[in-house]
A protein has these predicted regions:
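Structured catalytic/nucleic-acid-binding cores of DNA maintenance enzymes
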Residues: 1-295
Length: 295
């Protein structure tokens, strides 16, 4: 499932290429025809990410709310004046390349339109110079501005929103006996963290994922927030989750050793050499170093 940094990249992408544009909205697959009809011909005013949810705000008090879930992804394309990451979502190819398509030759030629839909395209957005296709989302609906506020009110603070208050997270996580590893995956506690960030942040803080939230010191909870903010900002910039330092990678490329513990079961810890462990926690695999995260 794309984590919060990917959705923030999406919001930035939509704001860059579609904000202020009148859009033709359709549902080639047919499952979103009624919603598409409500948005068709509207102007995209802004795009906002909160955790793993994307809110595309149109005029007329209409908002397209999208949650990509495990399999959702957006694809972009257009003429030479349009720039979009080729795919954002699942599978993770975030920001690897820009692949404009169309008749543009670099001088802003007339846009010939998007290609024929490929696969089950739930939503297609088309502007004068480009297009975006959505496939496989968990949630895709048209709501009002008030309903957007209500949806966001159910979410915890987002580490990538400048207005988010980390003390809200600290209070929430420390007030519960639930294991911190479970709480970090609860979007009502902190919005945007997924399995990778959970594993990596807890490793960096030296915290065992099974420790109850009430047993955390305030500085530990604050450290979780601070590391999450830092790593997710890096994720937005890099287009992928890289948590290791160059020293921990022993000079290897980022892509060859991107994480400390995530999906490294049985491999030696990059700090102490102890084999990394994994176990199921609330139906998801969690990874940790039993030596570095003993407490």
């Amino acid at each position: 499932m794309p984590e919060g940094h990917s959705v923030h990249r999406l919001a930035k992408q939509f704001g860059s290429v579609f904000a202020g544009e009148r859009l033709a909205v359709s549902s080639p697959q047919g499952r979103f025809s009624a919603g598409a009809a409500l948005l068709d011909g509207g102007t995209l005013l802004s795009a906002l990410a909160h955790g793993k949810q994307l809110f595309l705000r149109f005029d007329g008090d209409r908002v397209l709310r999208v949650h990509l879930g495990l399999y959702g992804a957006w694809s972009f394309g257009g003429d030479s004046t349009f720039r979009g990451a080729s795919s954002i979502g699942a599978p993770r190819r975030v920001g690897e390349s820009e692949q404009p398509s169309g008749s543009g030759d670099g001088d802003g030629d007339a846009y010939g339109g998007p290609p024929e839909p490929v696969g089950a395209v739930r939503v297609r957005l088309v502007s004068a110079h480009g297009w975006a296709d959505l496939r496989g989302p968990t949630a895709c609906e048209v709501i009002t501005g008030a309903e957007e506020e209500a949806a966001r009110a159910k979410l915890g603070p987002d580490p990538l929103q400048p207005s988010s208050d980390g003390t809200v997270f600290v209070r929430k996580v420390m007030s519960s006996i639930t294991a911190v590893g479970i709480q970090l995956m609860n979007q009502a506690v902190i919005a945007g963290i997924g399995n990778i960030y959970r594993a990596e942040v807890l490793f960096l803080q030296g915290i065992n994922p099974w420790r109850p939230g009430r047993q955390l010191r305030e500085d530990e909870a604050a450290g979780i927030w601070a590391d999450t903010v830092r790593l997710m900002k890096d994720g937005v910039r890099e287009g992928r989750i890289i948590t290791t330092t160059s020293e921990a990678r022993n000079g290897r490329p980022k892509r060859s050793a991107p994480n400390y513990v995530y999906k490294r079961t049985g491999e030696p810890c990059r700090r102490c050499g102890t084999p990394i462990l994994t176990a199921e926690m609330a139906a998801r695999n969690v990874y940790w170093c039993p030596q570095c995260q003993a407490a």
